[in-house]
Amino acid sequence: MKHTTRHILAAMLTAAALPALAAEKALTPIADNNELSIDSKIEVAYSCTIDKKTIPMTVMYGIKGNDIIVAQVKVGGNISPGLFRVPDANNLLNIYQSATADGTMWTTLPATPATLKQTDGGKLSYRNGESNTIILDKCRLDKAATAKLKN
């Protein structure tokens, strides 16, 4: 467990350590810290894997109108910076990315505020050179844990 916690903590605290590198496709957030204003929030629990271990995770989503504009991931007491929604031209995923140089990214299956509590997540990763390093994978909705959250 120490090894996994160390990886998660490193990924969430690398904003100052990793240089910003150009991605294959530029992703422009729908909102950023300077213009962030949400109407409501929804917290969802997931069960993810890494190194054949199951790790619980929660994500707090910020909602503006009928759009999910920001996500904040919590794993083992560590909280990510705001991960801002970026458009996916193919509408295959909901993509949330850090506005800082660390390139932390959270992806989920397509969801709206109305379907968040019924939709599986995907991967939590961070930029490592020219590719992404996966922190948590196969994040599945944990309905029982989600039901216990204060929403």
Feature locations, PLM:
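N-terminal signal peptide c-region/cleavage motif recognized by signal peptidases
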Residues: 17-19
